[in-house]
Amino acid sequence: MAYNWPRTLQDASTTSEPVELYRSLLSSADDHSMNIISIGFLTNLADLLRSKSDDVNSMSGPDLISAKVSELVVMGGYYPSGWEFNFGGEDPDATAYVVENWPKDVPITYSGGELGGEIFSGQSLTEHSPPDSPILAAYQWYVGRCSTLRESWDPLTTLYGILGLDGFERIGVKSPLAFANEFGYNSITSSNGSNAWVNDSSVTNQHYLRLADGVSNSSVAWLLDQLYIHDPIDERCFS
């Protein structure tokens, strides 16, 4: 993808380290204005939490997060309990550190493997995408075997991270998602990254997602496909 589409970055060695970039972006943001969407391992977020005052900002990592972040959205875990790759596949200690040390005044929403793993999107890309679509190319190269159909873990998480539960009306549809719980928290086994939801009425800042009542996997796949194939020149989301 990097070699086939125009880009401003020419040399990856000139990029900032992840924590430096996080601290710089958060420092320049308005208070409580940033959603962080995590669709991979949690190592960089753990390092952000451990970061200290520096030349970029005098606040510690947790204080900077509390001041600038409105919500953390995580593609990770399996609900109400289980094992999932983003939590346990590479750095389970980081998973446990982030989940256990994330500031209590900043909500966390989890999109689990059981949710996106049952929604197969991308089928419409080959027939309906603009021919120069980087989304089409990404799916063709990654999925392979003349297919663009794939599970929707990351796209679904990203869509929620952008719109939340209440923002879908901005694109003319009802929210296909809902919170699966009113209270409770994620408990992580640091040795392997497995998780289990603990019902605790005193904890109300953590949620995991489910499909809204009456919503099917296929209807969410259709919605994602419409966004994948949408021409960015067209200001309308749906015709």
Regions from the language model: what does each represent?
Residues N86-S239:
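Conformational coupling and interaction surfaces
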